[in-house]
Amino acid sequence: MIGFAITALGFGAGLVGYLLLRRSGTGWRVGRLLAAAPERSLAQAAALAADGEPGYVRLHGRIDSDEEFPGDDGKPLVYRRRRLQGRRGRGGWATFDDQRLAVPFRLSEKGEQVGIDTEALGDGLVVVPRESEGVAGDLTSDAVSGKLPEMPPETPVRLRIEQVSAVDHATAAGVPRIGEGGAVVLGAGLGRPLVLTTLDLDEAMRVLAGGRRTELLVATGLLVATPVIMVIGLIALAAGL
């Protein structure tokens, strides 16, 4: 029957789209949250926190901190994540050493301030990373914070550094709440991670897509088309086609 074939096609399109998104890792979810979160001012975020009404919102402001630390290039930083990763066949990169250094910082705009929960900031950080690659045989014991893992010396490894400068502007998505001392803090919540990027949204999406931008576009198209195809199939079935 034509209706059954169309319905099966819709189901198949949805399945393929879902599998393509799964292959892209967490990037697609972070990008979707960043794009879909309603934009609010810092003052509005403070009001949400004061009312005790949890809401996942997107904020923008200038990064501000009373403490900073120097980066390798001398630029003042408020957050740095340094990861060593090993290649696992076609499964991508697996992290075996993860070091983070952060100081308290906040978003500021027009006299308003909202702090960032640095403890919650992880895979939701979207910046242009600094990367260098080599092989496991080049690593020394002081390259990692703990014990150097055992792996074949020819295993590809890479150093990935992501950092946030004290002179940047940033966009962040999360749930505002009242923290210690009555200050407003933006963090994870409602089952969603804290997201922060120092890039404009279009560039952030490109970084999240990485080399899988075409796959993500195809997956999005398939998922958008799936309900349309399914409805057409059900109509055809109802019509006896």
Predicted regions and their residues:
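OB-fold and OB-like single-stranded nucleic-acid-recognition modules
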Residues: 1-241
